[in-house]
Amino acid sequence: VESSFRYAARAYATRQPGVQEILARLSELLFVEALRDQIDQLTPEATGWLAALRDPPLARALTALHGRVAHAWTTEQLAEEALLSRSTFAERFARTLGMPPMAYLTRWRMLNAAQRLRESPAPIARIAAEVGYESESTFSRAFAREMGMPPGRFRQVVLGQA
């Protein structure tokens, strides 16, 4: 990391082509290193997202879930990704992350949807499909339950149109 800093400082000081890209990659490297350091410092009893990433079976399941948010996941399928039995996976997931796998999936989908509502003018029905909902009305109810307001209202509020 130290040599990367020196290289980036030289590139910046001499205004070499591509310096912005170098700085962006260095920022990513520092972020990953900071996360790794935090994970390494966790106690065996630690809970939360970082603790789950330290647990290889849970990390496999989270990687699959995060990578395919629109997939119609079941606890059984996530347990298969984790290479654990359904009951062992569900208990370990809830103990480590503080909620059952399907509650986590819903929360993750709503956070993804919220980001898309902020950043994209796409219709709500399309955003619903992108995060795994076939029905806009089912998505809207789930979004309101998780985020405290329906998706259309959320978009208005975050875009300053309310």
Q: Over which residues does each language-model region extend?
A:
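Short, Lys/Arg-enriched, Trp-marked, Pro/Gly-tolerant hinge/linker segments that flank
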Residues: 12-27, 31-71, 76-81, 95-100, ...
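DNA-recognition helix of C2H2 zinc fingers
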Residues: 140
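Terminal helix-turn-helix DNA-binding modules in bacterial transcription factors
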Residues: 60-67, 71-79, 84-85, 91-137, ...
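Aromatic/histidine-rich interaction motifs
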Residues: 1-6
